[in-house]
Design a protein with these regions (language model features):
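DNA replication initiation on ssDNA origins
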Residues: 1-97
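Modules that initiate DNA replication and primer synthesis
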Residues: 2-6, 14, 50-52, 96-98, ...
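Hydrophobic, Leu/Ile/Phe/Ala-enriched alpha-helical segments that form helix-helix packing faces
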Residues: 30-34, 65-73, 115-119, 151-161
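Alpha-helical scaffolding within the catalytic cores
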Residues: 84-87, 117-121
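Short beta-strand
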Residues: 123-130, 161-166
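Basic/polar, cationic surfaces and motifs that engage anionic cell-wall
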Residues: 163-215
Length: 254
């Protein structure tokens, strides 16, 4: 484990851009590692919690990266919708290309060590500051109905943020700048641990605990509708059960 962690320390993507300029090459690599194209990829620019009220959210296709950069420079964070579709709502998602986790309850070293003890080596990681977004990219995209329960099981298993279970989840775009609540750009969102390895769905599922079956509710007997009767077998069972009750003995308080 220590050797693997040490190896990952040197695996990353360098940024050579000027301060506050979006690293377009890194943003495109984020897209390429997911196996996505610009036509099915959507971005969102959102202000940090507690920041300027006049900073309006923006959404658009990845092809409008220059517009997204301006929004970033104004103090909004930039996000990428990970799965493929026609927009940024769950109903818009048509194909799921990866599974992922985020965990900001632990240090970055603890996040990675915990992941590697449970799950395969990541395809890549996006480092946002205090948090790691860990990705497992699928060899073949899968349908949303198949993806949802597996993503939920993954998050539960690694104790990740339950908010990242949604189909249309957006995560920070690599190459963009992190904006604080004062709308100040403080650090570049970078990429690390880039292996490019992709996985069969079965390989990922094999790492997850089996789903425990839900207990089945015991049906309760209901009185028959007015004028109705119980089936004869049911009445016979009740009579047999009543015969097992000891008779009342007078004077014993029973």
């Amino acid at each position: 484990m220590e050797n693997l962690l040490a190896f990952f320390e040197g695996v990353g993507v360098e940024n050579s851009n000027q301060p506050w300029q979006l690293d377009a090459a890194m943003a495109h690599q984020h897209l390429e590692l997911l196996g996505k194209d610009e036509t099915s990829s959507f971005l969102g620019a959102y202000k940090p919690n507690g920041s300027r009220k006049d900073l309006k959210p923006w959404t658009g296709p990845f092809s409008e990266l220059e517009t997204a950069q301006r929004k970033n420079q104004e103090g909004s964070g930039l996000y990428l919708c990970i799965n493929n579709g026609t927009g940024l709502k769950d109903a818009d998602i048509q194909q799921c290309v990866a599974l992922w986790s985020e965990d900001d309850k632990r240090s970055k070293d603890e996040q990675l060590e915990r992941w590697l003890a449970r799950m395969p080596v990541p395809t890549f990681i996006v480092e946002t500051g205090k948090s790691l977004h860990i990705y497992l990219v699928l060899i073949q995209p899968i349908a949303p109905a198949l993806w949802k329960p597996i993503q939920s099981r993954l998050i539960d298993f690694v104790d990740g943020d339950p908010a990242v279970k949604s189909l249309s989840r957006v995560l920070r775009l690599a190459g963009s700048w992190y904006a604080n609540k004062d709308n100040e750009l403080t650090r570049l969102v970078t990429m690390r641990n880039v292996t490019g390895k992709r996985y069969d769905l079965e390989e990922i599922v094999s790492c997850l605990p089996e789903v425990e079956p839900k207990p089945q509710p015991v049906p309760s007997l209901k009185f028959p509708p007015k004028g109705g009767t119980y089936p004869s077998g049911t009445i016979r069972n009740i009579v047999d059960a009543l015969r097992c009750i000891p008779p009342r003995v007078p004077g014993t308080g029973t």
